[in-house]
């Protein structure tokens, strides 16, 4: 329940029609400073992660294989869960209200689909992936990583805060298996050029050809499955896609 400060009345945070949480009660600024000293609980090592608390039906040999970094309001994460029911996907989001929304959204979807066990394969955690990614994933654990509409950090002095940079690319390569894929999408051409430049210069990545990218069944979903992507489509903005393979 959420209190309307103007009216003094208590409003439901969940729609009575869909049973899903309403985004207007979870609003937060578009981006968060990744360098700030946020307070996070994080595991000391991947072996300490309690995955069963996030995925109730997880098998003893199962591991998270997809990571949506900066998952926003979870639209694309939900799509991943629908497309790959046998894979475990995690959304990582730094903003507290936004991550709360995704967690509540997944809980509501699981409840609505209790008979089919749908959406048991997706989860969200609030964390700073720029700092704590290796604390969650073992070497070569991930098959796919997604960076969709990341903060462009337009000012030159803040380019070091961009989630794609040389130091972090080595961390991503560590948790990605050989042949694993990194999907990037932005509506900012300058950021797209930055991503392509940094990833093609890194010795552990190669860019997929247009033919390879277009043949990937995930590619069409990258454009508007996420809330940010859908907004770009509504505003008739540009999309800049680049997919890279871990060598």
Curated annotation (Swiss-Prot):
Annotated protein name in UniProt: tRNA (guanine-N(7)-)-methyltransferase
Keywords: Methyltransferase, Nucleus, RNA-binding, S-adenosyl-L-methionine, Transferase, tRNA processing, tRNA-binding
Keyword tRNA processing included in the entry's annotation: yes
Subcellular location: Nucleus
GO molecular function, one term: tRNA binding
Reaction catalyzed: guanosine(46) in tRNA + S-adenosyl-L-methionine = N(7)-methylguanosine(46) in tRNA + S-adenosyl-L-homocysteine
One annotated Gene Ontology cellular component of this protein: nucleus
EC annotation from Swiss-Prot or TrEMBL: 2.1.1.33
Location, primary (coarse class): nucleus
Gene3D superfamilies (UniProt xref): Vaccinia Virus protein VP39
SUPFAM superfamilies named in the record: S-adenosyl-L-methionine-dependent methyltransferases (SSF53335)
The protein's annotated pathway: tRNA modification; N(7)-methylguanine-tRNA biosynthesis
Pfam (any one): Methyltransf_4
UniProt superkingdom: Eukaryota
Residues forming the catalytic site: 151
Protein role: Catalyzes the formation of N(7)-methylguanine at position 46 (m7G46) in tRNA.
Name of the top EC class for this enzyme: transferase
Bridged cysteine pairs (disulfide): none
PROSITE patterns for this protein: SAM_MT_TRMB (PS51625)
Family stated for the protein in its record: Belongs to the class I-like SAM-binding methyltransferase superfamily. TrmB family.
Binding residues for S-adenosyl-L-methionine: 70, 93-94, 128-129, 148, 226-228
């Amino acid at each position: 329940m959420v209190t309307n400060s103007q009216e003094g009345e208590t409003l439901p945070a969940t729609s009575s029609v869909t049973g899903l949480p309403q985004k207007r009660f979870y609003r937060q600024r578009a981006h968060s400073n990744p360098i700030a000293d946020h307070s996070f609980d994080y595991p000391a090592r991947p072996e300490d992660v309690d995955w069963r608390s996030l995925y109730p039906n997880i098998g003893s040999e199962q591991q998270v294989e997809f990571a949506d970094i900066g998952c926003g309001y979870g639209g694309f994460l939900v799509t991943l869960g629908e497309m790959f029911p046998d894979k475990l996907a995690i959304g990582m989001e730094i903003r507290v209200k936004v991550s709360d929304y995704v967690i509540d959204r997944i809980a509501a979807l699981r409840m609505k689909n209790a008979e089919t066990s749908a959406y048991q394969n997706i989860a969200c955690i609030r964390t700073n992936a720029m700092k704590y990614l290796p604390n969650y994933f073992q070497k070569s654990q991930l098959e796919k990583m997604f960076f969709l509409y990341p903060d462009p950090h337009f000012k030159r002095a803040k380019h070091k805060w961009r989630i794609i940079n040389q130091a972090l690319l080595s961390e991503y390569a560590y948790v990605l298996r050989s042949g694993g894929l990194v999907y990037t999408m932005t509506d900012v051409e300058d950021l797209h050029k930055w991503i392509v430049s940094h990833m093609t210069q890194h010795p552990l990545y190669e860019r997929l050809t247009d033919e390879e990218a277009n043949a990937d069944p995930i590619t069409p979903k990258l454009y508007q499955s996420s809330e940010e992507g859908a907004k770009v489509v509504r505003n008739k903005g540009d999309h800049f896609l680049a997919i890279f393979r871990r060598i």
